Amino acid sequence: MKRIRFFDIAKGMAILAVILGHSAIEANLFMPHRTAQIIVSICFSFHMPLFFILSGYFMHPERKFRWAKESKQLLCTYAVTALCVLIGVTCMATLNHESRVLALRQWGMAALYGSGDVSDLTLWPVDFRIGAIWFLLALFWARLLLHFFAKLPYTFIWVIACFLVGYGSSRYVWLPWSIQAGMCAVAFLYLGYLAKKYDVLDFVRRVPYIWINAFLIWIIDIVFFDGMSMAMNSYGPHPILAVVGSIAGTLCVIGISQLFDKVAVLGDTFSRIGQASLAILCAHLIEDDVLLQSWQSYLDMLRTLFPQVPLVLLSFIVRLPIDFAGAALLHYVPKINEWFYPQLAKQHQLNRAGIVHKRAFPLEK
């Protein structure tokens, strides 16, 4: 399927929202501020739902589940990123004259458990969370489950049941590998799949007032936001509003992306960021975990140097080049780069197909 640029733009906006949201959380922990809380509400109201919905949009669950491809793109990517975290925290422990063994044990357990945040409901004690790459594990489970449900009658019922079981069980126990997060994410993937199947975007284009309704719902969701986190199946005290609001927010961001697509500079910039969103997510996770114990002291230093600049903005500005540099580095690592940049794997396949075609038909012009 030909790449749709405004979807890349939407993913670019979403990955920036991930980094900005985490920057706001750190800034708010350091010095609680209403601006940071508003930014958290906006970012977390849509960024992860958008990634799952867009993933579902390009799925073909009626086909066979491609174990090799999904494992490389999601599980191997998770493993490489987690390994980089372990190397990074070991280096930081050495620099800070702390126990390398303790750092490896704590972060190794976090990587093994694969939880997006710390929980008291884990099967065994886990001191740290692996963080944002919970998304990779959850997406793997969600894709696998949707492929299974798509071959059953009443797929919609199975998807709802899966969401309810994942959501309900997570109130009592938090299983490893973000299994329950994946069970809930199935619903968002399925919505994306249905949006493609029934050409919802074309319908919205023909009925413009839907944009207004979606925007109003999204604003209401942001105003009443109280801690939605797909990582831990936490949808706040108003779970229905959180889910509906995240869908409305995703639709609004796609609408904004279509507008950006008409402006050359904005379209080019955000689409490039979107195409690198998986690599940026993993680079951001490495930075976030490795520097976890140091961010508070860094924020104190930044506040002293630039007292007039909002702390959230300072944190975001510092993180962004680190994450972009890490993503760029991943682009140049042979073989592994195809896991973090799926378009490279696709291009490689096309090149190989072209070579085979030329060998089969050497005289063809």
What are the language-model segments listed below?
Residues 1-365:
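Alpha-helical transmembrane segments and their immediate juxtamembrane cytosolic regions
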